[in-house]
Every structure is written in C-alpha cells, then in structure tokens.
Swiss-Prot record:
It comes from the Bacteria. The keyword RNA-binding applies. Homohexamer. Residues 70-86 have a biased composition (Polar residues). Residues 63-101 are annotated as: Disordered. One of its GO terms (cellular component) is cytosol. This is RNA-binding protein Hfq. Belongs to the Hfq family. One of its GO terms (molecular function) is RNA binding. Keywords: RNA-binding, Stress response. RNA chaperone that binds small regulatory RNA (sRNAs) and mRNAs to facilitate mRNA translational regulation in response to envelope stress, environmental stress and changes in metabolite concentrations. Also binds with high specificity to tRNAs. Positively regulates the expression of the yst gene for heat-stable enterotoxin (Y-ST). It comes from Yersinia enterocolitica.
Length: 101
C-alpha cells in the first residue's frame, strides 16, 4: 500500500462499511451526495438514485454527514483520528535546505 493511502483507505472504508451519507465536493465546485459504494486507487463509486464513478483527482473534499471512526494500523497505538501529527508536540521551525549552511 502506498504511504499516501494509509489514511485515505481506512477513512473511505469506514464510510462504505457504515453506509454514512457523504457530500463530495469536486475541484470545480460541484457538490455530489450519496454513499460510498466502493473505491479503488483512482475512483470512488458513489451511490444515490444512480451510481456515479468519481475520479479521485477531481475531488477536493469528502464530508461525512456524521463523525466516523477510521483507525488505521497505527504502530504508535494512538487512538485519535488525526494521524501523522501530534498536536501536543512543540512546533519546530522548518528550515529549507537552501538556507542551511
């Protein structure tokens, strides 16, 4: 599994499993609504009165109608839904490699 998919897949799978109604906003501003029927690396199959195949590269935002629990296999044992950052950790300033001497 690609590193970038480690949050996306569990989130979409929880939406599919729990049949959570979602609003999907496309990059052109169009809002689609329905339930995630299926998904793969490139598309989401969204079901409402009809099924629509929505290409992920066209999606801006996926908004569930209610909170979902989407825990991936996180080796740190963290139980929060925000993987990849620790909000309680002190922030270190980032330094570009061009600035480092």
């Amino acid at each position: 599994m690609a590193k970038g998919q480690s949050l996306q897949d569990p989130f979409l799978n929880a939406l599919r499993r729990e049949r959570v109604p979602v609003s999907i906003y496309l990059v052109n501003g169009i809002k689609l609504q329905g339930q995630v029927e299926s998904f793969d690396q490139f598309v989401i199959l969204l079901k409402n009165t009809v099924s629509q195949m929505v290409y992920k590269h066209a999606i801006s935002t996926v908004v569930p109608s209610r909170p979902v629990s989407h825990h991936s296999n996180n080796p740190s044992g963290s139980t929060n839904n925000y993987h990849g950052s620790n909000p309680s950790a002190p922030q270190q300033p980032q330094q570009d490699s061009d600035d480092a001497e």
